[in-house]
């Protein structure tokens, strides 16, 4: 049992950074943002305090930063700062997966070994996806390293949720429609 009353929800990719795109050309950033807004509302009515990293299609990089790579780095630093503002919280970063073969589908959770509760949170989320949304999903949670910056450096239990594969046309259509 992880006692917490605050949920940070992150929608990566915003502004100039669209993330990956579905076969139909729908950018990841819009799908992530729509899922974030729905999740924020659901968690709020369930009694949780929710803080989001963005609620519009924008980058949250520091002003005056030039160049896409520098803006993306600043955006990541600022999102991490939001995740680390308070303790007694859990953090969820919403992403969409993509692979060269369109046959792959299903949500998958990633966590870093830097917080022992991150693995438990990933297991709970993966289990909920399996039970409530994707009974055929047999994906396992995966440990990540520093390449998943927010997961690795967050002080709170943090999970990156890959909601599905935009490279799978059926799943991409569902993610776009349901968002």
Region annotations inferred by a language model:
Residues 39-50, 132, 149-156:
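A structural motif corresponding to the C-terminal end of an alpha-helix
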Residues 1-107, 111-120:
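Catalytic-core regions of hydrolytic enzymes
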Residues 80-88, 126-128, 165-178:
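Short, surface-exposed, charge-dense and proline/glycine-enriched linear segments
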Residues 93, 100, 139-179:
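Active-site-adjacent mobile loop/cap segments within catalytic or ligand-binding domains
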Residues 16-23, 70, 133-141, 157, ...:
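Peptidoglycan cell-wall recognition and remodeling modules
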Residues 117-143:
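Active-site-adjacent substrate-binding region
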């Amino acid at each position: 049992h992880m006692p917490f009353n605050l949920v940070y929800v992150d929608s990566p990719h915003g502004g100039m950074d669209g993330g990956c795109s579905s076969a139909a050309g729908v950018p990841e950033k819009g799908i992530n943002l729509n899922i974030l807004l729905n999740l924020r509302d659901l968690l709020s009515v369930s009694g949780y305090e929710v803080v989001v990293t963005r609620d519009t299609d924008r980058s949250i990089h520091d002003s005056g930063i030039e160049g896409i790579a520098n803006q993306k780095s600043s955006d990541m630093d600022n999102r991490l700062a939001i995740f680390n503002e308070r303790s007694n919280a859990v953090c969820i970063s919403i992403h969409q997966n993509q692979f060269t073969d369109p046959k792959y589908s299903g949500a998958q959770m990633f966590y870093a070994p830097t917080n022992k509760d991150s693995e438990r949170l990933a297991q709970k989320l993966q289990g909920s996806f399996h039970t409530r949304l994707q009974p055929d999903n047999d994906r396992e949670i995966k440990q990540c390293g520093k390449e998943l910056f927010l997961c690795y450096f967050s002080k709170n239990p943090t999970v990156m949720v890959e909601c599905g594969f935009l490279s799978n046309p059926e799943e991409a259509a569902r993610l776009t429609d349901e968002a």
